[in-house]
Amino acid sequence: MKTTTKRATKKLNAAIGPAVRNFKPPEDLTVAEWADRHRRLSPETSAEAGPWRTTRTPYLREPMEAFTDPKVKKIVMVAASQVGKSELELNIIGYIIDQDPGSILYVQPSLDDARKFSRLRIAPMIRDSKVLKAKVSDIKTRDSGNTILQKSFPGGMLTITGSNSASALASTPARYIIGDERDRWAISAGTEGDPWALAEARQATFYNAKAVEVSTPTIKGSSNIADSFEKGTQERWCHQCPECGEYGEIIFDRIHFEHTHKRIRGKKVYKITGPITWACPNCGCIIPEEIMRRQPAKWIAENPEAYTTGVRSFWLNAFSSPWTPWEKIVLKFLQALDDPQKLKVVYNTLLGQLWEDR
């Protein structure tokens, strides 16, 4: 082979190599398996930077695996703060980009929220996960076609917007819709009406469309995410009692504790004086936190028939979070007792419960 031919072949391989790699057949993975293999948590957004481990938050495995179930068209997650619900969304986005590309419409409550999430969460994920960095060009690259609110990749485009942006919601075809903090969305996208209905209309031409709706709960009677949960399988994260072997949800009403308080500069300061325990709803046995954290747990559906409609819904509070000791939850509750607005925040973000105005 002539030298010029060798050079030409080398240049051709260099030019088409990246494109060929991008069109490799997808791996046979669920979202959880993909995240365990490819996702890295970024140091500026995680206290546990490094490889993602689904075993750290086992309650996220089932919602992630539901995304690759062909019978599931929509996933609803109602969750307290700091349990990893944003990581659920990010893992799904990463999986789509790498394994099952298509147009994604990712919606935050406002455009400001969208820009912030893109800079602080999506950009670091792409930067630190090699398979994503290889497919999504840096916005600083000339002619990359990418901005803070739009990320192109082979086979698709990620559009990041706010529920108050009628133009994006009404004009962007999307196979995938992911809606974050649904209960904080605008009532109407400008004059166009319900933002979720506008977003869903963008999926009309996709036979394989999927939607993910995520939020902390807010006010009883006006919570969009609670309404969506009711239409799904209504699954609760339940732990096995070490005494009777039955499964039960760890909720605040079944948490037992003793405490004292004293006033310092006119303010009540609380102290937990003994172990915090959980009462099994089946046998009544009192089990300490350290034992319950080691017990097997699983999702149990209250409305399993909804699976036939393609909607799986999950509800999770902070008692199962590996980052939130029960004592912290109890103290936050006690400290908020004299302030209804603070108590409302505790109900929504820690207890994972709807607040009922009295």
Feature roles, as predicted:
Residues 2-358:
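Phosphate/NTP-binding elements of NTP-utilizing enzymes
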